[in-house]
Curated annotation (Swiss-Prot):
The lineage of its organism: Eukaryota, Metazoa, Chordata, Craniata, Vertebrata. It is found in: Cytoplasm. GO terms for molecular function: nucleotidyltransferase activity; tRNA binding. Gene3D superfamilies: HUPs. Belongs to the TtcA family. CTU1/NCS6/ATPBD3 subfamily. Its main location: cytoplasm. It comes from the Eukaryota. This is Cytoplasmic tRNA 2-thiolation protein 1. Plays a central role in 2-thiolation of mcm(5)S(2)U at tRNA wobble positions of tRNA(Lys), tRNA(Glu) and tRNA(Gln). Directly binds tRNAs and probably acts by catalyzing adenylation of tRNAs, an intermediate required for 2-thiolation. It is unclear whether it acts as a sulfurtransferase that transfers sulfur from thiocarboxylated urm1 onto the uridine of tRNAs at wobble position. InterPro entries: CTU1-like_ATP-bd, CTU1_C, Ncs6/Tuc1/Ctu1, Rossmann-like_a/b/a_fold, TilS/TtcA_N, tRNA_thiolation_TtcA_Ctu1, UPF0021_CS. One of its GO terms (cellular component) is cytosol. SUPFAM superfamilies: Adenine nucleotide alpha hydrolases-like (SSF52402). GO terms for biological process: protein urmylation; tRNA thio-modification; tRNA wobble uridine modification. Its EC number is 2.7.7.-.
Length: 341
C-alpha cells in the first residue's frame, strides 16, 4: 500500500531514510539532506565568506555529492565561497584513469575549475609501479600517505584556504573502530574532528561528517548524479574492509550504531589540553611532520633505494642515516628488503 511523505503529507514517499526512519518523497528528502549539511556547515563554522575552498574530487559518490551540494548551498545561502575541484591521479591503470574522466565531466556539469596532480609528477612513481615493488599487503600505506600530501600540494598550488573531503559518517565510524582495534587512541581526536588544521599544510573539513553512506547513495541516485562506482583494484586486502564489514553487521541490528560509534570516539579522544607531539617541518621537502623526515619522504627513500619496508613500521633510528646519506648495514638492508606479497 502506497505511503504518503511524512513531511509534506501530499506526495507519495519513495524512500525510508536509513538515518531517521522517516518515509519521504524525493523533494522532501533532497531538502532534508541538504539542510542537514547546511546545519553542519553553519554550526561548525566551517567557512568564512570570500574563502577559496578546494573540494577533494575522486569521481566517487561521496566527492560528487559533496561538490554538488556545496555548489547548491553556496548559491542558496550566499556563502560567498570560491569553489574548485582538486583531484589526485595515483597512476592506477583501469581505475583512476576512468574515474578522472568522471571528474572532468563533473567539472563541466558544475562549472567549477579543476586541478589534477599526479604521483608521477610529485614523486616519480605511480601506484602501479609501487605495487610491483611492495606487493598488496602494505600498498594502502604508501597510497594513503602520498595521496594526503598530494592533495595538500595541489591545494597549495591553487592558493586555497581550506580543503573539503567527502568523508561521511560511515567512514568516520570505520576509522574509530580501526583505531580502537589497533589501540591507537591518540588518533581519535583527528578522525572524529570535523576540522583538522595541525595535521596538514591547509585546514581540512568534512561537511558530510553526519551523512550516512546509504543516504549519500540515495541522493546521488535520485538526483541522477554522474559518479564512478568501481572500488580500487588494490584495496581488497585493506584493513578498513574488515572494520566496514563489522560496521554493516552492527548497523543491520541497530541503525544508530554509526552515530553511536562516532560519539564514543569523540568522548574518548585525547583532550585539547593534553600535550601531543610537536609538529615541525620535514628537513627534506618542508612538509609538516613530527619527525625530521616526513612519512612520504621516508617511504619514497625506501622505494628509490629498493628498501620497501623502510617506511613500514618504526624505523626512526635510521632517519639520521638517510639524512646524511650513510650506507645501511647488511642486516638493516636485508630486513628492509623483505616484503610479504
Amino acid at each position: 500500500m502506497p505511503v504518503n511523505c511524512s513531511s509534506c503529507e501530499e506526495r507519495r514517499a519513495v524512500l525510508r531514510r536509513p538515518k531517521t526512519g522517516h518515509s519521504l518523497c524525493k523533494d522532501c528528502f533532497f531538502h532534508a539532506f541538504e539542510e542537514e549539511i547546511h546545519h553542519t556547515i553553519v554550526s561548525a563554522k566551517l567557512f568564512n565568506p570570500g574563502e577559496k575552498v578546494g573540494i577533494g574530487a575522486s569521481g566517487g559518490k561521496d566527492s560528487t555529492v559533496l561538490a554538488h551540494v556545496l555548489k547548491v548551498l553556496n548559491e542558496r545561502y550566499a556563502y560567498g565561497l570560491d569553489l574548485i575541484l582538486v583531484s589526485v591521479d595515483e597512476g592506477i591503470s583501469g581505475y583512476r584513469d576512468d574515474s578522472l574522466e568522471t571528474v572532468k565531466r563533473n567539472q563541466q556539469q558544475y562549472e567549477l575549475p579543476l586541478k589534477i596532480v599526479s604521483y608521477q609528477e610529485l614523486y616519480g612513481w605511480t601506484m602501479d609501479q609501487i605495487v610491483k615493488q611492495v606487493g598488496l599487503k602494505n600498498n594502502c600505506t604508501f597510497c594513503g600517505v602520498f595521496r594526503r600530501q598530494a592533495l595538500d600540494r595541489g591545494a597549495m598550488m591553487l592558493g586555497v584556504n581550506k580543503i573539503c573531503t567527502g568523508h561521511n559518517a560511515d567512514d568516520i565510524a570505520e576509522t574509530v573502530l580501526m583505531n580502537f582495534l589497533r589501540g591507537d587512541i591518540a588518533r581519535l581526536r583527528r578522525c572524529t574532528s570535523i576540522t583538522t588544521g595541525s595535521e596538514g599544510a591547509i585546514p581540512r573539513c568534512k561537511p558530510l561528517k553526519y551523512a550516512y553512506e546509504k543516504e549519500i547513495v540515495l541522493y546521488a541516485y535520485f538526483k541522477k548524479l554522474d559518479y564512478f562506482s568501481t572500488e580500487c583494484i588494490y584495496s581488497p586486502n585493506a584493513y578498513r574492509g574488515h572494520a566496514r564489514a563489522f560496521l554493516k553487521d552492527l548497523e543491520a541490528i541497530r541503525p544508530s550504531s554509526i552515530m553511536d560509534i562516532i560519539h564514543s570516539g569523540e568522548n574518548l579522544s585525547v583532550k585539547e589540553d593534553v600535550r601531543m607531539p610537536v609538529q615541525g617541518t620535514c628537513t627534506r621537502c618542508g612538509y609538516i611532520s613530527s619527525q625530521s623526515l616526513c612519512k612520504a619522504c621516508v617511504l619514497l627513500e625506501g622505494l628509490n633505494r629498493g628498501l620497501p619496508k623502510l617506511g613500514i613500521g618504526k624505523h626512526h633510528k635510521l632517519h639520521h642515516k638517510l639524512l646524511s646519506q650513510e650506507p645501511l648495514s647488511e642486516q638493516e638492508e636485508r630486513k628492509l628488503k623483505a616484503v610479504d606479497f
